[in-house]
């Protein structure tokens, strides 16, 4: 039974007759290999979420053990550089503000170092707010409106739309229903829960000259 290989802090792996070299990026602050990672498998290791970048760990990059003092020869099929299975995605703690590690990973979602997402890698870091894929709630800036909750993986238009905002105050134009006591002979002030119509409306029960006896 093959033993599990470990990456050393220097990025080199060793076990028996095979030796694997772990890819270390140019930035010294990012280390793609750790002592609890197996070198015989492909790992996708994220960098800090501050720059929203995932780096592909090119370990294993398999070399045959040198014979008779000859330099090692690189095998043709021992190099990975595009994607890896979600089984081997190993997240680090996200250091960026407003991000937390995701609980699960989507297969084939690991990105190479050259890919720079605008917001974040959705399979690795989630924002603290429940909005995914850079979605933001509608910003209803006009008075008397408030935004509806924005669901996950759904984007709202930037402008105010009828299904995106609910009126929270009185509309400043047009009268609402006016309640007038039917048996009153004097006009009453219109009442509509605080909203005043734009045009004064008087009651329909105003007395006429004939109703007053023409006196």
UniProtKB/Swiss-Prot annotation:
It comes from the Eukaryota. Pfam families: PMG. InterPro entries: Keratin_matx, KRTAP_PMG. GO terms for cellular component: cytosol; keratin filament. Keywords: Keratin, Repeat. Signal peptide: none annotated. GO terms for molecular function: structural molecule activity. In the hair cortex, hair keratin intermediate filaments are embedded in an interfilamentous matrix, consisting of hair keratin-associated proteins (KRTAP), which are essential for the formation of a rigid and resistant hair shaft through their extensive disulfide bond cross-linking with abundant cysteine residues of hair keratins. The matrix proteins include the high-sulfur and high-glycine-tyrosine keratins. Belongs to the PMG family. Interacts with hair keratins. This is Keratin-associated protein 26-1. The gene is Krtap26-1.
């Amino acid at each position: 039974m093959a033993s599990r290989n470990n990456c050393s802090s220097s990025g080199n792996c060793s076990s028996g007759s095979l030796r694997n070299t772990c890819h270390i990026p140019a930035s010294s602050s990012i280390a793609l290999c750790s002592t609890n990672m197996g070198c015989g498998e492909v790992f996708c290791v994220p960098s800090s979420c501050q720059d929203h970048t995932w780096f592909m760990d090119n370990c294993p990059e398999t070399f045959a053990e040198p014979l008779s003092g000859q330099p090692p020869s690189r095998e043709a099929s021992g190099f990975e550089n595009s994607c890896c299975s979600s089984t081997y995605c190993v997240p680090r703690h996200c250091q960026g503000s407003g991000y937390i590690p995701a609980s699960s990973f989507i297969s084939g979602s690991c990105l190479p170092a050259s890919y720079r997402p605008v917001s974040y890698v959705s399979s690795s870091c989630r924002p603290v707010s429940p909005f995914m894929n850079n979605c933001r709630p509608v910003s209803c800036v006009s008075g008397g409106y408030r935004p509806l909750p924005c669901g996950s993986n759904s984007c709202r238009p930037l402008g105010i739309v009828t299904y995106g905002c609910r009126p929270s105050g009185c509309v400043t134009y047009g009268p609402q229903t006016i309640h007038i006591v039917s048996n009153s002979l004097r006009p009453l002030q219109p009442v509509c829960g605080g909203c005043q119509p734009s045009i004064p409306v008087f009651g329909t029960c105003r007395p006429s000259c004939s109703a007053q006896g023409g006196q």
